[in-house]
């Protein structure tokens, strides 16, 4: 089929898919394919195929308008995924083109996709799957063409509204075809070097671009509200960051490359400049920066669940500390509990959180110190404790980390009569969170607060087994962590507003416990070992809401999914030893085995002093 025949077929034959509401949070950010729409910032040679330029002009030898690669190429390389490219250089939001009459625009692009592609475009199914990233760089030519053809400053808002409405028709159709993940470039052609000396042209283009981008934010906000993941990149902010610190981005000049012969033939020289020789497009190096910004945006949701998980793990560790104060003392150790004791416990814990569809792999670890007191009354004991901990969550490659200063208080109690025992704990904690994310050059940071609750109970019956005691045990442990909303500081093109969120866990367990009581050289040693089968009983699903600070109306919903609820094992062991009159040293080690969301390991070392 000829190129022109393909275009006509696409326009006439593509199905008009009705817009549908997704109505559920986005759940896929694992990109395995890029589908590109737009103009010369994304085009990989489609324009030259359509108009019959083969080979491409010398100034654009690769078919890209940078003389080398564009941001789609960079993104494809960073994500290691293929590209289906429908962008046409010079495309306007309608079906016209700045390069001349009869050359198609955005309408042809999206209709060609829905019609299955072919001709200058790749052959496709006409629908998207949940791991496709759909990119748009459209609207810049509308502003540029409007100014170049005599458009006025007063007429710019109305003209921009028409362009935005036209673009919306195409975006609506593509969302209806299943687009789940959108990346939208928001440019402003007023800042291009080609009109650097023309303030009148700058004013007209700026008015047009500002109104167009605002209208597109409203359109994109509607998709995000229906569950589509929308990443909005403000290229003006990116340009301001580069201009403020060009050397950090690898540039010696933020203007257009000159002289032209050297720029076209020497890519290393051209890439010292932000803009290419045409004063309109970025160099390959400039486009590389844009691709890196988008990749950083795509990474962000995969890190947002860590603060909540950190709060849960910190709460759970304090729960183990409180519970161990009963496990390691009288009357659980078989002795009679009398009077007051004070204790100091140091603890550490670690949890390797496995990668999922909603989060990248990260490690949680922390250390803490707990001080408290117990009071025993024969077959029972009660106690209180205060804790300070320094937990952190760190992603592989340090792409993001959350550090916390945490204060916790809690109470516990238990009794043991003959072989029967029961114990429980309750606690609360305050978290002072420092959240950091890696940027392209400047990183992002936020300080916020959180809190958490913890509670648990355990009961069982131990039978005499020779010189030991053993028997069945059941347990339940609950934790809930809240993280307040926060706004990041740092690179304004990447900073986020993140809404408050909460995470919860309810773990049930059943197993067996073995205890002993030995005297060795006058030292009383009382070890124990516990083996449990545990299972997450709470649904634990949660949805995070966030937006770019540059486009706060586009609020994305990110579903983290249910917590892993498969059976897993937990082995705990420890003991106490009386080292001086009224002074006991105690220790506990605990680890999970076969847990789907990553195993945790913890340890405690403490000393009790009785009065």
Segments predicted by a language model, with ranges:
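Conserved active-site regions of diverse hydrolases
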Residues: 27-335, 346-355, 371
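Membrane translocator/pore-forming domains, dominated by Gram-negative outer-membrane beta-barrels
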Residues: 337-611
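Gram-negative bacterial Sec-dependent N-terminal signal peptides
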Residues: 1-28
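Short, functionally important structural connectors and interaction interfaces within domains
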Residues: 4, 9, 14, 272-274, ...
């Amino acid at each position: 089929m000829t190129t022109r025949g393909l275009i006509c077929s696409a326009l006439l034959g593509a199905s008009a898919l009705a817009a549908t509401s997704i109505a559920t949070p986005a759940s896929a950010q694992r990109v395995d394919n890029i589908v590109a729409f737009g103009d010369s910032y994304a085009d990989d040679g489609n324009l030259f195929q359509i108009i019959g330029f083969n080979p491409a002009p010398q100034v654009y030898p690769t078919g890209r308008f940078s003389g080398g690669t564009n941001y789609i190429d960079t993104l494809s390389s960073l994500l290691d995924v293929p590209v289906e490219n429908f962008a046409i250089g010079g495309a306007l939001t309608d079906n016209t083109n700045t390069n001349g009459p009869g050359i198609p625009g955005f309408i042809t692009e999206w209709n060609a996709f829905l019609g299955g592609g072919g001709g200058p475009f790749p052959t496709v199914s006409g629908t998207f799957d949940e791991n496709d990233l759909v990119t748009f760089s459209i609207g810049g030519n509308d502003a540029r063409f409007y100014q170049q053809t005599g458009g006025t400053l007063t007429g710019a808002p109305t003209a921009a509204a028409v362009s935005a409405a036209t673009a919306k028709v195409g975006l609506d159709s593509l969302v209806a075809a299943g687009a789940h993940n959108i990346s939208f470039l928001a440019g402003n052609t007023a800042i291009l070097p080609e009109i650097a000396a023309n303030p009148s042209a700058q004013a007209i283009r700026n008015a047009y671009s500002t109104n167009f981008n605002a209208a597109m934010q409203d359109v994109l906000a509607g998709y995000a509200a229906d569950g589509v993941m929308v990443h909005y990149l403000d290229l003006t902010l990116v340009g301001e960051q580069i201009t403020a610190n060009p050397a950090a981005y690898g540039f010696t000049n933020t203007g257009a490359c000159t002289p032209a012969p050297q720029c076209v033939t020497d890519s290393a020289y051209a890439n010292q400049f932000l803009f290419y020789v045409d004063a309109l497009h970025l160099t390959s190096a400039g486009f590389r920066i844009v691709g890196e910004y988008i990749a950083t945006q795509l990474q962000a949701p995969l890190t947002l669940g860590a603060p909540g998980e950190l709060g849960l793990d910190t709460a759970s560790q304090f729960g183990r500390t409180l519970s161990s104060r009963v496990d390691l003392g009288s009357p659980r150790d078989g002795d009679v509990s009398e009077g007051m004791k004070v204790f100091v416990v140091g603890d550490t814990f670690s949890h390797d959180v496995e990668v999922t569809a909603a989060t990248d792999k990260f490690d949680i670890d922390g250390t803490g110190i707990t001080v408290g007191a117990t009071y025993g009354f024969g077959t029972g004991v009660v106690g209180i404790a205060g804790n300070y901990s320094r937990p952190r969550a760190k992603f592989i490659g340090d792409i993001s980390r959350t550090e916390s200063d945490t204060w916790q208080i809690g109470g516990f109690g238990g009794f043991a009569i003959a072989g029967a025992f029961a114990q429980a704990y309750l606690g609360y904690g305050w978290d002072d969170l420092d959240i950091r994310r890696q940027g392209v050059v400047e990183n992002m940071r936020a300080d916020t607060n959180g809190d958490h609750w913890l509670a648990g109970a355990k009961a069982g019956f131990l039978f005499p087994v020779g010189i030991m005691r053993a028997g069945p045990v059941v347990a339940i442990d609950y934790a809930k962590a809240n993280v307040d909303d926060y706004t990041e500081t740092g690179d304004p093109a990447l900073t986020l507003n993140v809404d408050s969120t909460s995470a919860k866990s309810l773990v049930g367990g059943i197993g067996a416990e073995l205890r002993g009581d030995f005297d060795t050289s006058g030292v009383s040693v009382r070890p124990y070992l516990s083996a449990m089968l545990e299972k997450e009983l709470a649904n634990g699903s949660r949805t995070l809401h966030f937006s770019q600070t540059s486009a706060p109306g586009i609020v994305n919903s990110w579903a983290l999914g249910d917590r892993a609820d498969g059976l897993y094992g937990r082995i705990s062991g420890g003991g106490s030893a009386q080292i001086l009159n009224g002074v006991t040293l105690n220790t506990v080690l605990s680890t999970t085995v076969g847990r789907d969301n990553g195993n945790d390991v913890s340890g405690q070392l403490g000393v009790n002093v009785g009065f």
